[in-house]
């Protein structure tokens, strides 16, 4: 927040407030638009955090969220196994591990090889098609992000953002749709990609 304030604090239409997203210092029905990008899945309960946020939305107000999508089952298993260890690391230790994952991702990426899966493997959550080797490993087996523009620091940061936070929940589109229904929000847009789910809804 200090970085953001230094760069944009002089603008009259922007206000920076640092607070617990589950204990916000605002009255109910305060905002006409709420935007929460890649935040809710890092709270202790994504669904209840979302429900809490909607209390601050005025009638006919909009809310937009992005949450992590659930991955293939082996990737989910490995994520949980590794994260049980990385969340207990110091910042320095997890940074080093995140560098290891970036180097691994880079090594796989530099192969410049494709793999073709002739048909779906439902038990593994693998879809048929032709994949870059690094992308295939990344989406189906292990988070080892590598930025194709060779931005090493960004690659380390993306890996760190996955492995260090105490909470990093993944969800399905069905789950997210239910949150909106339960909060009496009508979904106006929904986009699901491998990494996550983006949804915007309006309060009825």
Region locations from a protein language model:
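Conserved SAM-binding loop
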Residues: 4-5
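Short conserved AdoMet
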Residues: 9, 44, 58
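Conserved SAM-binding strand-loop segment of SAM-dependent methyltransferases
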Residues: 10-23
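A short acidic, Gly/Pro-enriched loop at the edge of an enzyme's catalytic core
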Residues: 22-34
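A short SAM/SAH-binding and catalytic strip from SAM-dependent methyltransferases
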Residues: 32-45
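A short glycine-rich, Lys/Arg-flanked "PGG" loop and its adjoining helix->strand segment in the class I
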Residues: 47-62
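Conserved class I S-adenosyl-L-methionine
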Residues: 62-116, 129-136
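C-terminal lobe and adjacent flexible extensions of AdoMet/dcAdoMet transferase-like proteins
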Residues: 133-204
